[in-house]
Amino acid sequence: MTIASFTDLGVHTDLVASLESQSITEPTPIQAECIPLLHAGRDVVGQARTGSGKTLAYTLPLLERIDGKQDRQQSLILAPTRELAEQIASVVQPLAALRNATVALILGGVSYDPQRRALSAGAQIVVGTPGRVLDLLESNSIVADGIRVVVLDEADQMFDIGMAPQV
């Protein structure tokens, strides 16, 4: 089955327009495989090379599930490193804004205060590293009740470097 466009995959028109403005017009194989499954609410384990579009493969369906009118955490994306979390947030933030949603970037090694403010301001999407996310879960700054989508980006790397207990 060949998927010709993001529209064919059921991606919302405002997101498709944003992708097209970045010259992203055709889904990659990982996107064509994962997006329909994620839209259907299925759990997915995806594996593809760096640069294959994995972040968009989970971000586009995730954004369809976010209610921008609810000021509470609704999704959590975990990454093993600060650099990857920052990269993910840079992809998610502009698309989230189209859905009236905000992103809180939660990283160790920096002050808690701005992160707590972003969470209490109602960020719907949390992108972060396991250690700091766990700290903020334990202090109730991140409220897990409303989280409906969890993404483990580079889960194998998190487990390889000993983060399995935190995850």
How would you describe each model-predicted region?
Residues 1-47:
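Conserved pre-motif I regulatory segment
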Residues 8, 13-24, 70-138, 146-149:
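Conserved nucleic-acid-binding Ia/Ib motif block in the N-terminal RecA-like helicase ATPase lobe
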Residues 31, 46, 126-129, 153:
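Hydrophobic beta-strand scaffold positions of dinucleotide-using enzymes
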Residues 51-53:
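Conserved glycine(s) of the Walker
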Residues 134-167:
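SF2 helicase catalytic motif II
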